[in-house]
From Swiss-Prot:
Modified residues (Phosphothreonine): T174
Keyword terms, alphabetized: ATP-binding, Chaperone, Nucleotide-binding, Phosphoprotein, Stress response
InterPro entries the record matches: ATPase_NBD (IPR043129), Chaperone_DnaK (IPR012725), Heat_shock_70_CS (IPR018181), HSP70_C_sf (IPR029048), HSP70_peptide-bd_sf (IPR029047), Hsp_70_fam (IPR013126)
Region (Disordered): 581-615
Chain's gene name: dnaK
Protein name in UniProt: Chaperone protein DnaK
Organism, scientific name: Desulforamulus reducens (strain ATCC BAA-1160 / DSM 100696 / MI-1)
Gene3D superfamilies: 1.20.1270.10, 3.30.30.30, 3.30.420.40, Actin, Chain A, domain 4, Substrate Binding Domain Of DNAk, Chain A, domain 1
Basic and acidic residues composition-biased segments: 598-615
Lineage: Bacteria, Bacillati, Bacillota, Clostridia, Eubacteriales
Family: Belongs to the heat shock protein 70 family.
Length: 615
């Protein structure tokens, strides 16, 4: 079994780690950074850019740059570039492919398996979408684990004794809070809650809105209509947010942000931490609802929580830390890196699956209740939230009308009382029910949740033994096997195109180098050069230059070879000329004509006498 990597596929940044020598280590990317921006860009020439290079060109190319795609996982959202629609799974797969390539470069071997983390509050559709993204990227996803649980693994692997911890995970686009009990290598999740639409992006947006309002008040110009200006504002807002975690005030200065009647307009606004706290107070308060819910579901009191782990870059915001401190009455634990601990935890779980890590048992839970729609549009729960997974549960139902020949099983996920208010996971029919009065047929509905939190449901007519089942494959926004296979093939095709593009660049670089060498050789030979050989080289150089103007890599390779032979002959002439010059120089010295030797021969010894003036 090859190396299994752990991936934190984040909203704004992603990270990859692996077990080495019994320890989880973060794998740096090709640019040398330990995290990779979850950004995908398409250049004007159609080249795909991922990570820091994509983020750098976002200001000048906002319409063709995709950020925070994780927020759309498990939905029908599509991104249209050059007339082609991309699903969130495909965009996420591009990010995963970059992380996979970086891991392969670091490890020096092929990587085909991974553990990928998701927010604890991700629905079944979002989990399935994440698994599909991995498949498109050429990865077998051995396990999907929850981000707070992964962070707890990273924190608690080397800890002794029993303790209860709360993981407060506020990332770029999602928020989770989980309570776990740790002891003797067992990591048991007691409860989890969260909000999949709350994260650092929302804090950034508050600053952007404030800057737009201030600029409009001062100049009358509405920057929200200018995509390029908005991208600059978004980048500056993120920097300001980060700076305000360490200082009490920061300045946002963006020259030439727009143009007015009298010429260029510049944005220059000071933002204090107090102002930032005021702008985002309701967002901080939104984190407290799930925090209270998780504590209530765990059946614990605040004084029974031993430690609070702060996970995700947004937990560096002072107001967030203060809210947690106030609620739990204790200082948040800052002994782990909030940007890397989730990937490290994923790598540890990967190590468990690969047999590298022993005596670790992870007991996670399902974040939302699961059930079916019953008579009157009621949501009947079969599996309650915070049930340890994997799990299986069945219940007997019956028909709602006399002689009903079939029933539709409407599978739902959520906490509301009515079916219409919950998330539909799928529907399927159980047919062939023999005629009978209502309430007589017995239909067993069985739910199974695997270790990844992915659901499958079956219905069985107890009278006839007829069984119908559905494996939930993403519900809304889910991909069929055919769609996934098509996307896998496209991803492989792109990888091949990328390889060809890289080869074309390398061949052109070789050609440039050889042309430079040819011209330098001709110059060094000067008047002593064999004219026929020079003409042959010059002709080959011109043909190579012409080939380089096109995109036919094979033609350039051929012309490279055609230049190499006459150039070798010319280089041999240059070498012989240099050898002759060196021999002539040495011969001159041997004849006594070297300057140093002549001077030595002309030295005359002089007699001298010392006079003593005191005599």
């Amino acid at each position: 079994m090859g190396k299994v990597i752990g991936i934190d596929l984040g909203t704004t940044n992603s990270c990859v780690a692996v077990m080495e020598g019994g320890e989880a280590v973060v794998i740096p990317n090709a640019e040398g950074a330990r995290t990779t921006p979850s950004v995908v860009g398409f250049s004007k020439t159609g080249e795909r850019l991922v990570g820091q290079v994509a983020k750098r060109q976002a200001v000048s190319n906002p319409d063709r740059t995709i950020q925070s795609i994780k927020r759309y996982m498990g939905t029908n959202h599509k991104v249209s570039i050059d007339g082609k629609d991309y699903s969130p799974q495909e965009i996420s797969a591009m990010i995963l492919s970059k992380l996979k390539a970086d891991a392969e470069a670091y490890l020096g071997e092929s990587v085909t398996q991974a553990v990928i983390t998701v927010p604890a509050y991700f629905s079944d559709a979002q989990r399935q979408a994440t698994k599909d993204a991995g498949k498109i990227a050429g990865l077998e996803v051995l396990r999907i684990i929850n981000e707070p649980t992964a962070a707890a693994l990273a924190y608690g692997l080397d800890k002794e004794g029993d303790q209860t911890i709360q993981v407060f995970d506020l990332g770029g686009g999602t928020f989770d809070v989980s309570i776990l009990e740790l002891g003797d290598g067992v990591f048991e999740v007691k409860s989890t809650s969260g909000n999949n639409r709350l994260g650092g992006d929302d804090f950034d947006q508050r600053i952007v809105d404030f800057l737009v309002a201030e600029f409009k008040k001062e100049t009358g110009v509405d920057l929200s209509k200018d995509k390029m200006a908005m991208q600059r504002l978004k980048e500056s807002a993120e920097k300001a947010k980060i700076e305000l975690s360490g200082v009490l005030s920061t300045n946002v200065n963006l020259p030439f942000i727009s143009v007015g009647a009298d010429g260029p307009l510049h944005l220059d606004v000071n933002i204090s931490r107090a102002k930032f706290d005021e702008l985002t107070a309701d967002l901080v308060e939104k984190t407290m609802g799930p925090t209270r819910q998780a504590l209530a579901d765990s059946g614990l009191e605040t004084n029974e929580i031993n430690k609070v782990l702060m996970v995700g870059g947004s937990t560096r915001i002072p107001a967030v830390q203060e809210a947690v401190r106030k609620f739990l009455g204790k200082e948040p634990h800052k002994g782990i890196n909030p940007d890397e601990c989730v990937a490290l935890g994923a790598a540890i779980q990967a190590g468990v699956l690969a047999g590298e890590v022993k005596d670790v048992l992870l007991l996670d839970v399902t974040p939302l209740s699961l059930g079916i729609e019953t008579l009157g549009g009621v949501f009947t729960k079969l599996i309650d939230r915070n049930t340890t997974i994997p799990t299986s549960k069945s219940q007997i139902f019956s028909t709602a009308a006399d002689n009903q020949p079939s029933v539709e099983i409407h599978v739902l996920q959520g906490e509301r009382q009515m079916a219409a208010d919950n998330k539909t996971l799928g529907r399927f029919q159980l047919s062939g029910i023999p005629p009978a009065p209502r309430g007589v047929p017995q239909i067993e509905v069985k739910f199974d949740i695997d270790v990844n939190g992915i659901v499958s449901v079956s219905a069985k007519d107890m009278g006839t033994g007829t069984v119908q089942s559905i494996s939930i494959t993403g519900g809304t926004g889910g991909l069929s096997d055919d769609e996934i296979n098509r996307m896998v093939n496209e991803a492989e095709k792109f990888a091949e195109e990328d390889k060809k593009r890289k080869e074309a660049v390398e061949v052109k670089n070789q050609a440039d180098s050889l042309i430079y060498q040819a011209e330098k050789t001709i110059k060094d030979l000067g008047e002593n050069a064999d004219k026929a050989k020079v003409e042959a080289v010059q002709k080959a150089v011109e043909e190579l230059r012409t080939a380089m103007n096109g995109n036919d890599t094979d033609l350039i390779k051929n012309k490279l070879e055609e230049l190499t032979k006459p150039l070798h002959e010319l280089t041999a002439d240059l070498y012989q000329q240099q050898q002759a010059q060196q021999a002539a120089a040495q011969g001159g010295c041997a004849g006594g004509n070297c300057g140093g030797q002549a001077e030595k021969d002309n030295v005359v010894d002089a007699d001298y006498e010392v006079k003593d003036d005191n005599k």
